[in-house]
Every structure is written in C-alpha cells, then in structure tokens.
Amino acid sequence: MENFFNQFFENIGEDKNREGLKETPKRVQELWKFLYKGYKEDPKVALKSAYFQGVCDEMIVAQNIEFYSTCEHHLLPFFGNISVGYIPKEKIVGISAIAKLIEIYSKRLQIQERLTTQIAETFDEIIEPRGVIVVCEAKHLCMSMQGVQKQNAIIKTSVLRGLFKKDPKTRAEFMQLLKS
C-alpha cells in the first residue's frame, strides 16, 4: 500500500515526505477497510438471523435509511437515502436488519442501479414477502466534481417485486406513505 501511495504522490507532483502526508497511507488503508467492509459480510446471513414468524399482512415501510457508497467508475462517493417497503407472507424482519442489509451492499464498490437491485433481490429471496419495493435517491460526487459538474442532481432508482410490481394500488400506497 505504501508503494501505491508513493507512486500516487509522485504522479500528482506531491512530496511523499511532506509532514501532512507521512501518515496518509496508513490512514487511507484504515479508511478503506471501513468503506469496503461489505465484502467481508454476507448480506443473506444478516437477514436470516433477524427475521421471525409474524402475523402482519399489511405493508411495512422503512424510510430514509441513509447510506454512503463508492462509485466503481471514479472511486468517488455517492450517498443518499433508501426506503424499503414490503408486504409479509410469513416472515417479518427486524427493522435494523434492513439497515444492515443496506450497509453491507453499500460498503462495496457500486453503481446505484445494482445497489438497489441487490437489496430488493436479497430481501425477496430470504424473507419471501408477497411484495418488496426499494427506492434509492442519491447524489453522486462523480457527477458534481467532474464531467458535467451538476451540483444539485439527484438520481432515483427503484426495484419492485411481487405485489408492488403487479398492483398499481399497492405501489401507490407505498409512494403515498413516502410523502407523508
């Protein structure tokens, strides 16, 4: 890692021995361990260990769960909120498990579209609800800091499964709950 940073500093014209940079390789290495810890965790295990049999057959919504991730194209952050709605069949998941699922997938090199899909697909596979919807809203620094440099752009993605995909009324109920 130290060789990588020495080469990086040299390529951008920095002095690797400058006081403020001496510990940078170690600090960044620790930061990267945290930012990409999702590779060391199994999202399916996180959900499997946090559900229980339930009797609820109405919509459950976890709204505005904040996340931070890294764009795999430019290695710049993107961040925002994810909302998950589901209609249980037999299993109800602990709310913190939804946040954990989001954290595991977001702590990897990502694109927003895949992040949204992975959350929905894993939730659908493990919890087997009658329907699940995931909506992700994010700001991408790769869009703000370079290229088109649009500071206020927000990208929205959604993935729908089961009743949310088949029934417009169910989808509309979820969207109304997000507004309230």
Swiss-Prot record:
A Pfam family of this chain: GTP_cyclohydroI
Cellular component, GO annotation: cytoplasm
UniProt-recorded Gene Ontology molecular function terms: GTP binding; GTP cyclohydrolase I activity; zinc ion binding
Catalytic activity: GTP + H2O = 7,8-dihydroneopterin 3'-triphosphate + formate + H(+)
Entry EC number(s): 3.5.4.16
Pathway it works in: Cofactor biosynthesis; 7,8-dihydroneopterin triphosphate biosynthesis; 7,8-dihydroneopterin triphosphate from GTP: step 1/1
Binding site for Zn(2+): C71, H74, C142
Keywords of this entry: GTP-binding, Hydrolase, Metal-binding, Nucleotide-binding, One-carbon metabolism, Zinc
InterPro entries (alphabetical): GTP-CH-I_C/QueF, GTP-CH-I_N, GTP_CycHdrlase_I, GTP_CycHdrlase_I_CS, GTP_CycHdrlase_I_dom
Superkingdom of the organism of origin: Bacteria
Gene Ontology terms: biological process: one-carbon metabolic process; tetrahydrobiopterin biosynthetic process; tetrahydrofolate biosynthetic process
First-level EC class: hydrolase
Family of this protein: Belongs to the GTP cyclohydrolase I family.
Self-association state and partner proteins as the record states: Homomer.
Protein known as: GTP cyclohydrolase 1
